Amino acid sequence: MIRISIDVMGGDYGPEATIAGAARVTEYLPNIYFLFYGLEETVKPVLKKYPCLASISCFCPTESYTRMDEKPSQALRNGRGKSSMWHAIEAVKNGEADVCISAGNTGALMAMSYFCLKMMAEAERPGIAGIWPTLRSESIVLDIGATIGASANQLVDFAVMGAGMFRALYHTEKPSVGLLNVGVEEVKGLYAIKKAGMILREVQLEGLEYKGFVEGNDIGKGTVDVVVTEGFSGNIALKTAEGTARQIGEILNSAMRSSFFSSLGYFLSRGAFRTLKHKMDPDRVNGGVLLGLNGIVIKSHGSANADGFASAIRIGYTMVHNGLLKKITADLRRFHQNKQTLFYKEDKATENEKII
């Protein structure tokens, strides 16, 4: 049984989307159980609309919820032990749930998750990993906005965690990994990026294949399975891609309605356009995963509808089913052991050269 705690109050649509999304996944996800957290007067009327959830869920009323405009520090101070978001995260900490999902305030979710679950011993900093539609299939990009800036060691941790997530979702034994940079040449880029590349080249790990630097246009091409960057660049890349997709959609829609022959062309090509729409639909890959914590937390888009929230649930379910946390913990531990051994040998070799 996979247990999923949900902050029902999060997002633009609240319970109307979160509970409806939970009801939809019952059609294709077996052995699932939900813990719903929210305000009783708001949630119970919506729950009554979905009798399919009655036997596979429980409702846990809370005193408050986290508003979308609250600062992380304010949300943590006001919501600790009270809000629906806090209780949903705490359920993972207490072993009552396997994964927490919220469409609420991103900063508040990061702060509460960090404070409640704490970091993995092997990881320095959490990162948000997003699933990115590409020409090949899907890639994972992280960090897409958890924090600003990253050291070489933190970028390396992101690479290891992202590869573990890719294996958990897509059953690829050795995902390819690239570092986002301003060019593919090894001499280009910030020191932290070049240092991270050097570490990934030198320290071998069975769970990933390092392919070197990649550029922004490689993300959409699907050049690698996992693209690693720091949160500032990652968030800009994400928002740029989302805006470009909407722009293309609006341009196509306008062009198809511009004349009779354009409309006829659209009618004849509607199957291809449906495929394009499905491929680029953000709801299909909705859900940013907070990696590096002692528990799985997923941030759904605040604007996600029921289908989008169902996708976030499906992602969380799949990662729990395939043992994401165990994979990441083992990979990080093995990687850092290999790194210590390698650089210890290099230091010894340097000392011997000095003696000679």
From Swiss-Prot:
GO biological process, one term: fatty acid biosynthetic process
Keyword 4Fe-4S assigned: no
Protein name per UniProt: Phosphate acyltransferase
Upper taxonomic lineage: Bacteria, Pseudomonadati, Pseudomonadota, Alphaproteobacteria, Hyphomicrobiales
Record family assignment: Belongs to the PlsX family.
Catalytic reaction equation(s): a fatty acyl-[ACP] + phosphate = an acyl phosphate + holo-[ACP]
The EC number(s) this enzyme carries: 2.3.1.274
Entry-linked InterPro entries: FA_synthesis, Phospholipid_synth_PlsX-like
UniProt keywords, alphabetically: Cytoplasm, Lipid biosynthesis, Lipid metabolism, Phospholipid biosynthesis, Phospholipid metabolism, Transferase
Any Pfam family: FA_synthesis
Entry's localization field: Cytoplasm
General function of this protein: Catalyzes the reversible formation of acyl-phosphate (acyl-PO(4)) from acyl-[acyl-carrier-protein] (acyl-ACP). This enzyme utilizes acyl-ACP as fatty acyl donor, but not acyl-CoA.
Species this protein is from: Bartonella henselae (strain ATCC 49882 / DSM 28221 / CCUG 30454 / Houston 1)
Pathway the protein acts in: Lipid metabolism; phospholipid metabolism
Highest taxon above the source species: Bacteria
GO MF annotations in UniProt: phosphate:acyl-[acyl carrier protein] acyltransferase activity
Enzymatic class: transferase
Listed HAMAP family: PlsX
